[in-house]
Each structure stands twice: as C-alpha cells, then as structure tokens.
Amino acid sequence: MPPLSLLIKPASSGCNLKCTYCFYHSLSDNRNVKSYGIMRDEVLESMVKRVLNEANGHCSFAFQGGEPTLAGLEFFEKLMELQRKHNYKNLKIYNSLQTNGTLIDESWAKFLSENKFLVGLSMDGPKEIHNLNRKDCYGLDTFSKVERATELFKKYNVEFNILCVVTSNTARHVNKIYRYFKEKDFKFLQFINCLDPLYEEKGKYNYSLKPQDYTKFLKNLFDLWYEDFLNGNRVSIRYFDGLLETILLGRSSSCGMNGTCTCQFVVESDGSVYPCDFYVLDKWRLGNIQDMTMKELFETNKNHEFIKLSFKVHEECKKCKWFKLCKGGCRRCRDSKEDSALELNYYCQSYKEFFEYAFPRLINVSKTIK
C-alpha cells in the first residue's frame, strides 16, 4: 500500500460537550449503536500493527471524536508505545488530535509537545460568540477552559491550529472573530461550514448557515485576509490556501475541495471502518480493521460505490466558468436526499459570487507565492 492515513474515533461519539450544531451527534443517532465506548487496547494494537505493516513511506493517525481526549492520556501513551513496537519498517509517523480543549492540562500539553502531535483546537471566536453554541453537557460555558488550552499549548510549544465553525451567528461577526484570533496571534485558521443534520431540510435551525450569510462571510473574511497579506502579515486560512493550491497545482490537499471522494479510512472505536467522517453510518460500514487488510477494506463494493457516487457532475457545473476552481465542492453539501443522486452544492451561489469578487486578488496572491 502507499502512505496511509486514518481518522480514528477512540471515544466513539462520546463527548463532554453538547454543541448545538454537532454533526457527529446527529449522525450517531441514526446508527444501531450510537456509541461504541472507548477503544479497547486489543483494537488499538491491531490497528497500529496493521497500518505500520501495510503502509509504505509514511502514515498518519488523526484522532477525532466525539472528544478523543475522553479516551485518557494513558490511551495515547499506549499508542506511542505500540507505534515504537511495531514500526519495524521505520516509517515516518504523523499524529494529530482534534479536541474541544476542555480537558487539556499540563500533562496533556507536555505529552502532545514531546510526541509532536499537530492539534486542531475547536474555538468559535471570543467569549460571547464561542459560548453561544459550545456548552458542556451541563449547559455551562466552555470558553475559559479552551482559552486555558491555548495558553498551555503556547507554553509547551504545541503546534496547533484553530477550528472555527461558521454558523449564522459567526458569519455576522467575522470582523470581531478575525481580530480576536489576530490579537491571540493564531496564525493557522480553519473556518468550517456548519452542517445541518444529514437528509434534513437545510437552513431550518437557528445556527444554520444559509447561502446568503455564507457569501457575506467569505467576502468579509477574504478582505481581512488579503489586507494582512499585502501588509506582510500572512495568516493561513485553510480554504483560501486550498484555492491557491488549486490555482497553482490544479488540485487541493483539502478533501472537500476536489469534487470527488476518496476513502478516508475512518475507524470507530470498535474497529469498524467507514469511507468518510460525514457518513459513519451502518449503511457505509466497510468492515473491521481487526480482520481485514487496508487493501481489502479499500476494495470493498461499498467503498467503490461510495466513491463512484461522487463522480457524477451536475449539468449546471459542466457549463460553469468556476468549475475548475470549485469542482462542485464537498459531497456532503450536495447530498440532500437519501438514496438519490447528488444535487447542486447548497452553497453554489455563494461560491459563484465569492469567486467573482475575489478571483483577481487570488491570482495576485498566487503569483506572489509561486
């Protein structure tokens, strides 16, 4: 096998927060088993051993949730022990962690630093914006704990980026959010579209990100980012970086920006494997990593079916001048009805208006960094 990447759910759908917009919470509600609990040691070892045995060149283990730190620090210490034990091919191993940050303490920060984890920290902006949708299971605010996590990451030199979910509210306060992140010297930002529950009517929740709001958000954010770029204060925003990659290389390193799906090898805590984080459903279970090779999982009929469904290009996309840049977008934003063909991207008009607005300046940036 070539280099391998896994997205792992060590605590399944378990989480100590109850964010109003959590897509994985709504997804797990539609499975026969909502949560598989904490990953057992034997599942962890089977997974590590298999990946290190079958990968070539390098491999990556990305831990998400739910909230992966609920698995405990000892779980991750065991992970490092197993990676050392089974890495007889001396592969380059990359580890990453996406966390809400509320359980991060000195021990966690020290561990993440010493073991060179790249961390994605969920934070929606300053206190009043963050706390609106990101409360814990008791309905309490979480901002102070997340802010504390950023301080610990800086203290221990943990490499981290900020993951900000774009809702109807955050879209209206992009200036305030961007300025806050700048004040905190956060240089690596990901702004992630809020997702309505799969196969439900889009736009019906208070937090729902409607296309017109997303259009304004993208334009305002781009203006702020571009001004900083011209002033020599470059901030990495993943979506804009992905557009620049597409302009310069023809393809982005961000999965959802290439128009077609690949197998992400999402591993639930019981060892079950799925092709995509947005589709961890019984219907798309490929098998179990404990008793199938990565090649066998990849070559299942379900995986081929899942990938094939994303290849159909909408008729309107075929004649759109922005298709080479947009490529139709992420499948999840084109999928509105179960067992039906993919539709036009929910944010199609947003992207069209944004590209008209920003493309000349994107070209200018691409020429500068080429």
Regions found by a protein language model. Name each.
Residues 33-38, 132-140, 205-208, 335:
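Short glycine-enriched, charge-decorated loop/helix-capping segments at active-site entrances
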Residues 11-18, 67-70, 261, 317-319, ...:
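Cysteine-centered iron-sulfur cluster-binding motifs in ferredoxin-type domains/subunits
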Residues 6-9, 60-66, 94-99, 237-240:
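Extended hydrophobic secondary-structure segments that form protein cores and membrane-embedded regions
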Residues 280-370:
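Flexible mid-to-C-terminal extensions adjoining Fe-S/redox cofactors in radical SAM and related proteins
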Residues 2-42:
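Canonical Radical SAM [4Fe-4S] cluster-binding loop centered on the CxxxCxxC motif
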Residues 136-144, 151, 155-256, 260, ...:
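Radical SAM enzyme [4Fe-4S]-AdoMet core and its adjacent flexible, acidic
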Residues 44-49, 53-62, 71-194:
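Radical SAM/AdoMet-radical enzyme domain recognition
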